[in-house]
Swiss-Prot record:
GO terms for biological process: nitrogen fixation; regulation of nitrogen utilization. GO terms for molecular function: ATP binding; enzyme regulator activity. Pfam families: P-II. It comes from Azospirillum brasilense. One of its GO terms (cellular component) is cytosol. InterPro entries: N-reg_PII (IPR002187), N-reg_PII-like_a/b (IPR011322), N-reg_PII/ATP_PRibTrfase_C (IPR015867), N-reg_PII_CS (IPR017918), N-reg_PII_urydylation_site (IPR002332). The keyword Phosphoprotein applies. The modification O-UMP-tyrosine is found at Y51. PROSITE patterns: PII_GLNB_CTER (PS00638), PII_GLNB_DOM (PS51343), PII_GLNB_UMP (PS00496). This is Nitrogen regulatory protein P-II. The gene is glnB. Homotrimer.
Length: 112
């Protein structure tokens, strides 16, 4: 099993969610996040003063899946989240040793 964490632009969430559903992903966890990468943020004007906004709004998606779905899920996220502009995001893939469904006690792939 693997866990995919994707940091994307907030307005791309619906497209990514739909793309993941189409490849067979049944559930995701979404967290609002703030961060910056190479784009370093931007400046804004407020009441005549200039402010540097370091952290940009992002959305973090977390999905755990069987190894057989990983490549298709990565491709789906890439295609759905892509704008071609700086700040499109990142995808991280890590191994998952165990999953346990709290309600039933199911483990492994049955618990996903």
């Amino acid at each position: 099993m693997k866990k995919i964490e994707a940091i994307i632009k907030p307005f791309k969430l619906d497209e990514v969610k739909e793309a993941l559903h189409e490849v067979g992903i049944k559930g995701i966890t979404v967290t609002e996040a703030k961060g910056f990468g190479r784009q370093k943020g931007h400046t804004e004007l407020y009441r005549g003063a200039e402010y540097v906004v370091d952290f940009l709004p992002k959305v973090k998606i977390e999905v755990v899946m069987e190894d057989s779905l990983v490549e298709r899920a990565i491709e789906a996220i890439q295609q759905a989240a892509h704008t071609g502009r700086i700040g499109d995001g990142k995808i991280f893939v890590t191994p998952v040793e165990e999953v346990v469904r709290i309600r039933t006690g199911e483990k492994g792939g049955d618990a996903i």
